[in-house]
Regions:
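Juxtadomain coupling helices with adjacent low-complexity linkers
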Residues: 1-9, 13-14, 114, 118-158, ...
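N-terminal membrane-sensor/transducer module of prokaryotic signaling receptors
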Residues: 2, 18, 43-55, 76, ...
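A generic structural signal for short
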Residues: 8, 62-64, 89
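Helix-loop-beta substructure at the N-terminus of cytosolic sensory domains
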Residues: 10-42, 161, 178
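Short glycine-/small-residue-rich flexible loop motifs, especially phosphate/cofactor-binding loops
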Residues: 21, 75, 170
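Conserved beta-strand and immediately adjacent loop positions that scaffold enzyme active sites
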Residues: 30, 100-101, 155
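PAS-family sensory domains
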Residues: 36-37, 42-70, 135, 144-147, ...
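Sensory/regulatory domains in signal-transduction proteins
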Residues: 69-130, 174-215
Length: 215
């Protein structure tokens, strides 16, 4: 497993592990990193995180466990094909979650593992941003206070380069509904009703910032 990885691949895993919990919180779903075992019939759970932003029952943490590959057909397909895979997974009897699996690739495009997002209410844009965080997080920022774990009371919005809000979680929508902005997606952060100049500043500098405000 780890002994077969290059230094680049190991460094990437260490960085991802540091912010895996935050990615789970953002995606409102369980996030798991899988690595191939020497025995091709098994896969190794390198790290697994449950979201703090979602209340309810959670599964046992499988970190450090070996799992038969036949029990994870979506993971097997992603590892074999070096491509993203989407499907359903039974959470409980008759209850299914959406599971999306993405290959982990190094700088040469070689697949050395897979990462899955499992959630009952997937938002493709927010999952994509969570994956972006994991894939491109600089090691120097993993201890930055702005990248701490989230809570159920935290709102999430995804803003495009034009300051257009293209995705938001239910908490963010509720927060702005109280401010009489019932349709948050499609608004701009520089609209008069929202007026968040901090977003534009972060886009210009590429540096995370924070500011407290009353709603």
């Amino acid at each position: 497993m780890l002994s077969n990885l290059t230094a680049e691949q190991k460094n990437s895993l260490q960085t991802m592990q540091a912010v895996l919990g935050l990615a789970a919180d953002m995606a409102h779903g369980m996030v798991t990193i899988y690595l191939p075992c020497e025995d091709k019939k098994f896969v190794y759970v390198y790290k697994q995180e449950q979201p703090r932003t979602q209340r309810g029952s959670v599964r046992p943490d499988l970190t450090g466990r070996r799992i038969r590959l036949v029990e994870e057909p979506l993971v097997a397909r992603s590892l074999q094909k070096n491509m993203p895979v989407r499907g359903k997974r039974e959470w409980d009897l008759g209850v299914f979650n959406t599971m999306e699996v993405f290959p982990l690739r190094d700088g040469r495009g070689r697949s050395y593992g897979a990462i899955s997002f499992e959630t009952s209410a997937p938002d493709e844009i927010i999952i994509a941003q969570s994956l972006e965080l994991l894939s491109n997080m600089p090691q120097s920022l993993v201890d930055n206070e702005h990248y701490k774990r989230m809570e159920p009371s935290d709102g999430i919005m995804v803003v495009d380069p034009n300051k257009l809000i293209i995705a938001a979680n239910n908490r963010a929508k509720h927060m702005f509904d109280v401010m009489e902005i019932p349709q948050l997606i499609g608004c701009r952060t520089n609209d008069v009703a929202i007026n968040w100049p901090l977003v534009g500043m972060v886009m210009e500098t590429g540096t995370a910032e924070s500011k407290e405000f009353n709603m």
